[in-house]
From Swiss-Prot:
The lineage of its organism: Bacteria, Pseudomonadati, Pseudomonadota, Betaproteobacteria, Burkholderiales. Signal peptide: none annotated. This is DNA ligase. Zn(2+) binds at C425, C428, C443, C449. InterPro entries: BRCT_dom, BRCT_dom_sf, DisA/LigA_HHH, DNA_ligase, DNA_ligase_AS, DNA_ligase_CS, DNAligase_adenylation, DNAligase_N.
Length: 691
């Protein structure tokens, strides 16, 4: 279905309603039938609410096929239609705390609950609270305890038969257990994919050179609606039961929470993240508690669901045209939204990395107003075909940096401009270069670049570096912008009068910072190396360098071959270290830091060179009792010769040293053809006389 024609203004309600209906139907088709949603949930909800409002104000504009009158979606060709005995309705949505309070008030009024003179409910309603999964709703039919059919929701009245595909989902029992087995039971629930399974699936897709899925919901929907059930069987799908359709041959539980408890006794998977609460306060407490844990959950959710718990009260409240009055879906702030990309700038990172950044028309997404979003690198911009002027989908989840997911291509204006990576750094004018094997372009300005200077100073002061307490980003900004500090060495020249003159920097703060700088002068070699901000050199590598060389000068003058002898230093890291110390400006700054005792550390001798004998780098396993040596003594001798002593035999084992009563390790060595030595043979190797 093509996108709707030009969007009419709100001043033309008839045309606007027709456009909204067409746009929502097109989005429904993409979402339910094609499994290729192209409209963020927040944008769909906004359009849907607008159509509801227009139809409420102009009842004559309501049409029987309006999306407000049904759930959405049509049965796709290739699957047999299934008419639901009981419609699979959607739920009304709430987005703010006020919506939940209003819902509770409507329910209480509908149940004639007692209120005080101010209208506050004094007889709280009992609710069952659950998670709102971001998956695909289905109905499972069991007859006399045996699974016989599964269908998708479809348009709420008619879905698609996906029985064979559902049979492949291990979480769904093919036979119910327990004693209260009904003659017929329609179980309503959600097929979804856990985050870890989604990541593994995309790894397999990449390895096979196949298209990756955008998110777990798309992966679940696409997997479930395969015409070949073998493909579905290869996909890691899961299921949670949360509702009921038809029930025959057993008593309906009195409460919704009781229904879910009963489901568990039948062997159906039910999510444990649920609660029974009372009143609006209980609902909101559950919502905010789940919201705090949302990112740590093993699956995606987009909200929570509230249902009046007592079945008789549900029956009294009944339904409106497309949703039950007794339930509400309380949705989290949308994690994706549409907005316009105004410009693409570039930011310069601490190591000179150039990152394209999208400048956006302000949009509320993920609980915050977003005006900037990362584009990662030049290749990502090209791959996603993102252009200036595009309407784009922006995603912000939790504390993750907002990113541009994709461009909406059929909304692209004729004058949209492609992004061109600048050739000069916007901060210092230095040349920008990109190495052939790297995705990131970098400024070559080193510590001369103001952007890198700020970041380098911030890194230098971090707790795991020189630990300069009180030297935050805002102070660094002022010091650099006022040209008071150009390199880390300048920090130690700062005086009290200079610091108190800074904006919002009191005398006490100035004295504390001076004290911190004084303490930072006495550090360790490992911390100092880490503080320099050498690319690819983290805390662990800095410690290894300090341990291996013992002092700074040998590191600064070490050729690449010597650096490669350091534990866990490979060619890329060695080249990065070598290039850093080869740059004259970096050496000058280091000398300034060391001059006149500004920064000092205890130095030691270099670590003993690694043994180069026949056992160097070999893996040896000890087994049994040796004639004259304890196991520990033999291990020390082997390790001193450069060998690694392992606890089990594998194909990577080079030698097995066996004594009396050697067991399964000896048998495994003989099976794999690994050389087996006695104690005398071990001594021969230790002496360097390989046989």
């Amino acid at each position: 279905m093509a996108r709707s024609p030009v969007e009419p203004p709100a001043s033309q309600p008839a045309k606007r309603a027709a456009w909204l209906r067409a746009e929502l139907e097109r989005a429904n088709y993409a979402y339910y039938v094609l499994d290729q949603p192209d409209l963020p949930d927040a944008e769909y909800d906004r359009l849907f609410v607008e159509l509801q409002r227009i139809e409420a104000e102009h009842p004559d504009l309501v049409t029987p096929d309006s999306p407000t009158q049904r759930v959405g979606g049509e049965a796709a060709s290739g699957f047999t239609p299934v008419v639901h005995d009981k419609p699979m309705l959607s739920l009304n949505n709430g987005f703010a705390d006020e919506d939940v309070i209003a819902f509770d008030k409507r329910v209480a009024d509908g149940l004639d609950k007692a209120t005080d003179l101010a209208g506050t409910v004094t007889e709280p309603v009992e609710y069952a609270c659950e998670l709102k999964f971001d998956g695909l709703a289905i109905s499972l039919r069991y007859e006399n305890g045996r699974f016989v059919q599964a269908s998708t929701r479809g348009d709420g009245t008619t879905g698609e038969d996906v029985t064979e595909n559902i049979r492949t989902i291990r979480a769904i029992p093919l036979t119910l257990k327990g004693k209260r087995i009904p003659r017929m039971l329609d179980v309503r629930g959600e097929v979804l994919m856990f985050k870890r399974d989604f990541a593994r699936l995309n790894e397999r897709q990449r390895a096979a050179g196949q298209r990756e899925f955008a998110n777990p919901r798309n992966a679940a929907a696409g997997s479930l609606r395969q015409l070949d059930s073998k493909i579905t069987a290869s996909r890691p799908l899961s299921f949670f039961a949360y509702g009921i359709g038809v029930l025959d041959g057993a008593d309906m539980p009195d409460t919704h929470s009781g229904l879910l408890d009963w489901y568990e006794t039948l062997g159906l998977p039910v999510n444990r993240e649920r609660a029974v609460v009372r009143g609006a306060a209980g609902l909101l407490a559950f919502f905010h508690s789940v919201g705090e844990r949302r990112e740590s959950l093993p699956y995606d959710i987009d909200g929570v669901v509230y249902k009046v718990n007592r079945r008789d009260e549900q029956d009294r409240l009944g339904f409106v045209s497309r949703a039950p009055r007794f339930a509400l879906a309380h949705k989290f702030p949308a994690q994706e939204a549409l907005t316009k990309l105004i410009a693409i700038d570039v930011q310069v990172g601490r190591t000179g990395a150039i990152t394209p950044v999208a400048r956006l028309e302000p949009v509320f997404v993920g609980g915050a107003t977003v005006t900037n979003a990362t584009l990662h690198n030049e290749d990502e911009v090209r791959r996603k075909d993102i252009r200036i002027g595009d309407t784009v989908i922006v995603r912000r989840a939790g504390d993750v940096i907002p990113e541009v997911v994709s461009a909406v291509l059929d909304r692209r204006p004729a004058d949209a401009q492609e992004f061109v990576m600048p050739t000069e750094c916007p901060e210092c004018g230095s040349r920008i270069e990109r190495l052939p094997d790297e995705a990131i372009a970098r400024c070559t300005g080193g510590l001369f670049c103001p952007a890198q200077r700020k970041q380098a100073l911030w890194h230098f002061a971090q707790r795991r570096a020189l630990d300069i307490d009180g030297l935050g980003e805002k102070i660094i900004d002022q010091l650099v912008e006022q040209n008071l500090v150009r390199t880390p060495a300048d920090l130690f020249n700062l005086g009290f009068s200079t610091l108190v003159a800074l904006d919002r920097f009191a005398e006490k703060s100035a004295r504390n910072l001076i004290d911190s700088l004084e303490k930072a002068k006495h550090t360790t070699l490992a911390r100092f190396i880490y503080a320099l901000g050498i690319r690819h050199v983290g805390e662990s590598t800095a410690k290894d360098l300090a341990k291996h060389f013992g002092s700074l000068d040998p590191i600064m003058h070490a050729p690449i071959d010597a650096l490669l002898e350091v534990n866990d230093v490979g060619p890329i890291v060695a080249e990065s270290i070598h290039q850093f110390f080869a740059e004259e400006h970096n050496r000058t700054v280091i000398e300034q830091l060391r001059a006149r005792g500004k920064v000092t550390w205890p130095e030691g001798p270099p670590a003993p060179r690694a043994p180069q004998g026949v056992l160097a780098g070999k893996t040896v396993v000890l087994t049994g009792t040796l004639p004259t040596l304890t196991r520990e003594a033999a291990k020390e001798m082997l390790e001193a010769a450069g060998a690694k002593v392992a606890g089990s035999v594998s194909k990577k084992t080079d030698y097995v040293v066996a004594g009396a009563d050697a067991g399964s390790k000896l048998a495994k060595a003989e099976e794999l053809g690994i050389p087996v030595l006695d104690e005398a043979g071990m001594h021969t190797l230790l002496e360097g006389h390989a046989r």
